């Protein structure tokens, strides 16, 4: 075989292009991956008993700081879950675990969550277009109230924009989804669309976070983020 022919050089060019593309993607980090499509948070690779890697922690409202950890859970898809363990009963207290290096306006976020315990609340949710700990949208499910609600949080104050009342069973995994496209927000629960909301308060790109309330001990699994055009 003649190694100097045009087919040979075409093959070499293709291989080099593939290697270069893979190298650029690997070196670009989480932001580049998020901009090109879907990421799934690798909870199964996180260290048990430690704070979940790739997240920054904050709080809306009053009360003590949250306690986020990686917990062993054989019912989780990878045997581990992200858990908020603090039982501070301050009612207007909303712990946030903000995913690092991701900013998007249009996206689809899905999680599995399990409400483990809580006297004041047993809630878990997703925050999007997060500017800071006091300004964002959030959808949350509550096992004590058997409902799902969508809020905007402006300067630390919540305002409900939509809701539905499905059964939210404690100590059982449920799926919660939020799709944000421009002014339209679509909320899904256990694979079914619940309701839609129109709002223009936060139009710019912002962060994505896991969210809980008050003394909720909540576990999170299968966090998937898909950026949209």
Please state what every model-predicted region is.
Residues 43, 109-111, 172-187:
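Short tryptophan-centered beta-strand motifs in secreted/extracellular beta-sheet-rich domains
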Residues 154-175:
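Short, aromatic/His-centered strand-loop micro-motif at the edge of beta-sheets
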Residues 50-83, 90-92:
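Extracellular glycan-recognition surfaces and repeat-rich motifs
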Residues 33-61, 221:
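Extracellular carbohydrate-recognition regions
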Residues 48, 84-149:
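Secretory/extracellular carbohydrate-interaction modules
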Residues 95-102, 162-168, 210:
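Beta-strand-rich interaction surfaces with strong enrichment in secreted/lumenal proteins
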Residues 37-38, 202-229:
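Ligand-recognition surfaces built from glycine- and aromatic
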Residues 188-209:
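Short, solvent-exposed beta-strand-to-loop segments that form ligand-recognition rims
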